[in-house]
């Protein structure tokens, strides 16, 4: 059997970006044949990627990009917060955000088919899955293209905001974006709050008010009051500005001669059910798998 040297392992790693131990195993299996080892690794990484594809991705990052008259916000998911801090994962996230802004894909499928690094976005994603050993997915994105101004704000890479606004001061856009990240409004104004959210809030208010035992006309006023309070709490323009509790966002914008046209807010993993594993069962499964190898 041919001797496997450190330089051979390093060369294979440089070609495939695979972990060192995987490179050494492939070279051993290929009896030192670099080309064969590279082929074996690509097969292994492909299998690794396909196995990982079925796993839940509830961690991840939000990335943003603004260039020219377009801006984007994207959410990419992985399985653990450890990988969410991985340099390769973060670099891929930033690249995807830039592609969304500059190429204007219609949806995630179109984005995945865009050319990247001599291949496609999806091929690069799969290579990343093989390299880090976790499923990676592009969950969603939003793109703003406008003659107005665009501001973005990222809070710890887990919360991202993009805002389209008008006004002379860039600080206004930054302040609004930061406020949205902190207060998480669901709509720009009360009139924009989705009907299903209002209906849910009304049902809850009706149940609470009915328990008071007060006359029907009083109950009706209590319900209306609760709904109006809710609308103010979840609509951006009616919220109290986080940097000045004497102003609403609407008042702050008016004083700055500015206006917000629209915004988007992404929170990593929002709406994704995380897998809750039984630790003992997971260890037992790993032991059983090891015995079969």
UniProtKB/Swiss-Prot annotation:
Has UniProt tagged this entry with the keyword Protein biosynthesis?
yes
Q: Under which name does UniProt file this protein? A: Elongation factor Ts
* GO terms of molecular function: translation elongation factor activity
- Output the CDD domains linked to this UniProt entry: UBA_EF-Ts
Q: What's a GO cellular component annotated to this UniProt protein?
A: cytoplasm
Q: Which branch of life, at top level? A: Bacteria
Q: What main location does UniProt list?
A: cytoplasm
This chain's source organism reads Burkholderia lata (strain ATCC 17760 / DSM 23089 / LMG 22485 / NCIMB 9086 / R18194 / 383)
UniProt-listed Pfam families = EF_TS
Q: Where is this region: Involved in Mg(2+) ion dislocation from EF-Tu?
A: 80-83
Q: Which family does it belong to?
A: Belongs to the EF-Ts family.
Q: Where in the cell is it found?
A: Cytoplasm
> What function is annotated for this protein?
Associates with the EF-Tu.GDP complex and induces the exchange of GDP to GTP. It remains bound to the aminoacyl-tRNA.EF-Tu.GTP complex up to the GTP hydrolysis stage on the ribosome.
Q: Which UniProt keywords apply?
A: Cytoplasm, Elongation factor, Protein biosynthesis
